[in-house]
Amino acid sequence: MFDMDGVIIDSEPLWSKAEQQLLARRNLSYSPQLKAVMMGINSSEAVGFLIKHYNLQESVGDVVEERNQLMAGLFRQFLRPMPHALQLVRSVHAAEIKTGLASSSPKELVDLALGRLNITGLFDLILSGDQVARGKPAADIYLTAARELGVSHENCLVIEDAPHGVAAAKAAGMCCLAISTSTNESELGAADRVVRGFDEVDLALLQDVMRCSRDRG
């Protein structure tokens, strides 16, 4: 299973830009500390944090919609895949391995991103953060994905880039490979393996991560 933001697509800088624009409209400033808290959680939780942090007198739903619109515009202008990510997705698909995408992003942005990259058909299942009760770091999205794919959790491997996502995968009892493209390697220590980028990843390494995790278990 793949996360999307920071794994399939190089979107973390775009999320930062969207949030900067969102706050600038309210004469508020954005900080790296906010990014660290919000990275990897679903839209409602991220916006709820912003509203509480800045004591905004606005509804979560309205701000989520505004944030999504800003992000959609940035996707249409600047969206690009992470280096070597699509090659791995295609390799997994060609090997006839059941493949899911489980993203904290809302469905409209997931559909937009995958459609623009023309990779929707490479996934057997696509789940977004607004389709489960609790977002990452809760295990809900990965457990739901495994159930819908018909795969037991111990036979699942998750590829993540954020501490919240790694925590969700491990809470679901799954193996986890972390890509340190968006987060310092030291913050991803709960993963079974950490690599710097997809140029280090192939099917053999994925199988090795699964074996190592089972050996430790």
Predicted features, each with a name:
Residues 15, 43, 81, 138:
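Conserved donor sugar-nucleotide recognition element shared by glycan-biosynthetic enzymes
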Residues 40-73, 83, 90-93:
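A metal-dependent, Asp-based hydrolase signature
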Residues 90-93, 106-217:
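Asp-based, Mg2+/Mn2+-dependent phosphohydrolase catalytic module
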Residues 8, 81, 99-102, 134, ...:
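Conserved SAM-binding loop
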Residues 1-36:
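Active-site neighborhood of HAD-like aspartate-dependent phosphohydrolases
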